Amino acid sequence: MSSERKAYDVTVVGGGHNGLVAAAYLARAGLSVLVLERLAHTGGAAVSAVAFPGHPARLSRYSYLVSLMPERLVTELGLDIELASRTTASYTPTTRSGKPGGLLIERPEGPATAASFRTLTGGDEEYAAWQAFYAEVTRFAEVVAPTLLDPLPTERAIRDAAEADVWRDLVARPLGEAIERRFSDDTVRGVVATDALIGTFASLDDPSLIQNRCFLYHLIGNGTGEWRVPVGGMGAVTGALAKAATEAGAEIITSAGVSQIRAGDDSAEVTWHDGHRAHTVTSRHVLANVAPWVLRILMGEGEDPDTKPQGAQVKINLLLDRLPELKSGIDPRVAFAGTMHLAEDYSQLETAYADAVAGRVPTVMPGEIYCHSLTDPSILGDARAGMHTLTYFGIHTPAALFEQDREAHKAEAVARALAALDEHLVEPIASYVATDASGRPCIEAKVPQDVEADLAMPGGHIFHGDLDWPWASNRARLETPAQQWGVQTDHASVMVCGSGARRGGAVSGLGGHNAAQAVLGSR
């Protein structure tokens, strides 16, 4: 601790990106702010690191892309960050009747996209359906996105501003119904559906509509839904946030493990340990940038295994000597520049879900690949010419699959993930993978349990729990600033400021911004 100060206006528990956003806003408003981070560095999941000894490449190991962070937030905090657009939105390699091909979607879409749809589907109808569907999604995003930095709108307000058919397709009915009704090609259906399944374990027909909520969050960022690459890696984003917070006067202490939060009516006490001794600090407000499940434990409510979130993803980071060649003949610099969909046909997604529900690692692993170094070569450092990073995000791999014999099942999942890529490559991916200083392949894999161990996200759930609609129900109590901003807990002095907030999830800063506004509104 840089001082023996015992009281602050606000203590933020957790120095991930949302905690840093909250600290920056509150310190700029003149409040005294203390941020306590368990790890030796800030940033949480939004960090960059040298993953492979002997290579300077800095990988974004957990979080990869930015979409939901409002440009207004970046401007208000004066963040010196650059978010680069990818020239390819997505490429989906295919094999039909033994012939390799693929679906290319440019950014922005142009003649090559239309031609790719035509070649894949045999006509222009599917691309017309695609354009109509995403035009509707964009119009809905333009309704929702402007509300994200304001107090929660009601469901009625959003519904009244939306088109009735769009509300039905995206909000009222399971998303799978709209996809099956509006598209006929299995691959096209799958490309649409995958945004509903990132970090979310569900069937596309799930009556809970969790898949709809996930889809919505992935498509509303800044009203466009574009996912961009942070130049310098995800660590550049959180580095800029930490700088903004400290320059405004916030105090950040790392290697500070919080063990207890005691809430009173007008203040709360936080107990933390620096590795040598315990400290206690009192604040008018405590903002929890930890999962709500973890917060309940810190507040003395005990662990409840039945409500513990469960992540459902496999993350694989690779460093390559060169980009792989694809059997379809497409330029690898085009194919890998965006999101590459693997084994994500609609039918494959549903089959993989059924496999996982039955307790099996999916026989055919659906997932996505990103090559950030094509958009941002700076993350490679002074690596050899031709080298590239490659990141795989596998879906429908819930934590339960890895509870028993974790390493064996992890190896099985990795093998199946890479096999889904190998199917479309001229040579197996293993022949492209670089080796580290000890001669080992530059491959690291993380299942949900690894994410939990590294980042204390319960169950390895990347959103801290299931996402919720970014508006309040018509019957919601919106009497206090915390309720109005969607950051309330059962204690007036404690608020949620992370991904577990009403509009949390992804690298957006929304949880931090909204908790800060609730604090300022409570003064």
Give residue spans per PLM region.
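A conserved FAD-binding loop/helix module that cradles the flavin
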Residues: 499-520
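N-terminal glycine-rich phosphate/pyrophosphate-binding loop and immediately adjacent elements
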Residues: 4-143
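C-terminal segments that line or cap access tunnels to active or ligand-binding sites in enzymes
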Residues: 324-449
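Helical element adjacent to the flavin cofactor pocket in flavoenzyme catalytic cores
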Residues: 218-267
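Short coil-to-beta-strand
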Residues: 105-106, 208-215, 385-394, 490
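Rossmann-like flavin
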Residues: 99-207
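Mid-domain catalytic core of redox enzymes
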Residues: 230, 256-382, 486
